[in-house]
Amino acid sequence: MKNSRSRWFALMFILWALGAFAQPPEYELDLHWPKIPMGDNWLTGGIGGMCIDQNDHVYLLNRQNVVPADLDGARLAPPIIELNPQGEVVRGWGDPDLLGPRIHDCHVEGDGSIWIVAAGNGYIQKYSNDGSEMLMQIGETGTYDSSDGSREGAPLNSDRAQFFLPAAVDVDKETGDIYVADGELPGGNSRIAVISREGRFLRQWPLYRTNSDSNITPLPHCIRLSNDGLVYVCDREADRIQVFDRDGNFQRNIFLQFSPISAAEGRNSGERGSAVVLAFSPDQEQEFMFVINQNSVMIDVLERHSGRLLTSFGNGPGRYRGQFTLPHGIGVDSKGSLYIAEQEGRRVQKYNLVD
């Protein structure tokens, strides 16, 4: 009797333990999204980033790095491409001279206005939803936060609303404060800067380093704010996500695992670091976190609160369906579908959540 009761309790514990751990969501590639050809026979360059609005419209940042020979009768797509949930083009817009050649990230606010980060410039810009009006610019045109104001100057990380190679942006829904990951590449700034909705500098902080990892170049490559008051930053070169509170107090590291891609397959392990960009699942608790792991060329699915890796998917580097070539942007819509934008692959792929 005692042994039977012990076995029963053991079985109940196992069942409880299995249920206590989050089960990873499953996805299937949507072969019919987006609609091809896109727009008026458009050809895109590298897709530097993407974002999704509350109506599940997808905005692609087209870097237009296309040579005339690539066009072959096609037309160069505009810098900003808006797609509806069916994968059809709603509109395209954007002045490449204003946005620059390295548009890198975007964020859509609740009213539909869209923030765009031009990594090669010293500013970020806010546009009306249709792109017809630039509503705000933070940072002075032609000026960098450097010792001499130029691209060649030494980075300052100064207490002002000016940037030097900004990488990503997100907005606090409660306060309207703008969080900028400022420092996409070596030679630029390396900080998280917080700006008021009026464009006034509020505070900043660096990526967290200890004596053991002080030699790793701090490059904040992405930034996303969670519903529970935390700030998630891609510490790209250190292969991890760093988590802070809204005031910049360090909370913890979430390290990424990866299987290096060999040089023969066109990718040197550690060349850029694995933590590139992330997104959260659409539930209020944001149970899952999706991270582009650029070293393994996979999408990592993690349990957000614990940082535990649940699964990864992707069929390795390549240009076939379900493969990725330098994935650089990720988004999740209200239904839980995943979107992966590729810089060298020059496309976006959609993965539907399997019920």
Regions found by a protein language model. Give the residues of each.
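Bacterial N-terminal signal peptides that target proteins for export
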Residues: 1-10
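Eukaryotic scaffold repeat domains enriched in small/polar residues
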Residues: 23-355
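Intrinsically disordered, low-complexity regions enriched for glutamine and histidine
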Residues: 3, 21-22
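N-terminal signal peptide c-region/cleavage motif recognized by signal peptidases
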Residues: 17-19
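CBM-like carbohydrate-recognition segments
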Residues: 11-14, 325-326
